[in-house]
Amino acid sequence: MVMRVGLLGLGTVGSGTAKILLDPAHRHPLVGQIELARVGVRSLDKPRSVAIEGDRLTTDLESIVADPTIDVVVEVMGGLEPARSLILKAIAHGKHVVTANKAVIARYGDEIFTAANEAGIYVMLEAAVAGGIPVIQPLKQALGVNRIRAVTGIINGTTNYILTRMQREGGDFESILADAQRLGYAEADPSADVDGLDAADKIAILASLAFGGRIKLSEVYSEGIRHVTTADIAYADRLGFVIKLLAIARRDGEFDETSDQSLDQLQLRVHPTLVPVSHPLASVNDVYNAILIEGDPIGQVMFFGPGAGEGPTASAVVSDLLNLAANLRAGTTPKATNPLLACSHQHYCKVSPMADIVSRFYVRLLAEDEPGVIGKLGLCFGRHQVSLESIVQIGQHETRAEIVIVSHEVTESNFQTALDELREYREIHSVASVLRVL
């Protein structure tokens, strides 16, 4: 039984997907049973890296999603519209969907999966998170017997590349960002990457799968790396840390063994973090991604690999097609989707406000270089139940001392209240940097 595919988009990922489907030799035999039937593009005249016969190409994307001979629609166009509308129309016409579009899934997943579940349709999204790293299906299947406690990841290659080079070379953010743009690792408008928005989309998807509930993207805290300086990276190194942009989804509290649903709250946050050099994620460098999953009884397992690019992302797209082809050959009936492939949860996860999050903190500040300042800092933190691991004068700028503080675990609200008080002190010139510590 041949499965006919309509491909929407023939850019980097679309071209990579087409190359695999048109060259099935020495791959799984089922790849040869997947036919690239039609390809939708914006322009027929654009030069492309893959040769597609003219009768397969069309600029009429809606005709593909409505074509009764198409079994699966692959959406790799990117952007929110018309991608969202075309996915919904494909579902309405009874087509299964494979997408690499994390922005659409993170924002419109409710609408899309509700429609898919009602229609008995699969929406597959292995390529939407971390490119070539196979993590979506393991979360649904191999790790499904575990009670997941946390998902922590480096899931944006652009920011990891920038921070890695800042660490190695001591270069500043702006100059390395410009290099990343020239090399194609960063977009002309890098905001989604460097401001943490891309990672927020991805951790929302991973959290939904890991914790079995829907996620409101607006409840994911996101903070980027623009304010990370070479001074912070150097001081972190002296303290035994590296700075990484981490995406964190963590379950607060214990499991309720009387219920099949966990009603406790989740932490959902993206921010630059001081990571101990001994931690598995500390050695993930350049454009590589990694996702560390903690669960019971498995303990810790980490997925590592390329997070983007034509080959890795296309591999993930075709892996979803392979799963669909195998499932359709097995003959599941309409309205009875395989629960290990479908996303059928309906309830929303409860998300803890940032004020309630417990974390360690790193602070760098400039203060007047005079007796009693460090003691005054310690007293202020103590009044707000902030216990300090270390407080040291690490440098000097003219008449001002540069002081670095690392706290023990404390609630975000208590720590920020202490900082607000410090900023009012005559002796404190500025709070130059505040970062969380893993």
Where are these regions (language model features)?
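N-terminal glycine-/serine-/threonine-rich beta1-alpha1-beta2 phosphate-ribose binding loop
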Residues: 1-93
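Substrate-binding/catalytic subdomain of NAD(P)-dependent oxidoreductase enzymes
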Residues: 175-283, 287-290
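Rossmann-fold NAD(P)-binding glycine/threonine-rich loop
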Residues: 83-93, 102-140
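Short, ordered loop/turn segments at secondary-structure junctions
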Residues: 42-44, 78, 102-104, 110, ...
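Glycine-rich phosphate/pyrophosphate-binding beta-alpha loops
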Residues: 277, 301, 305-311
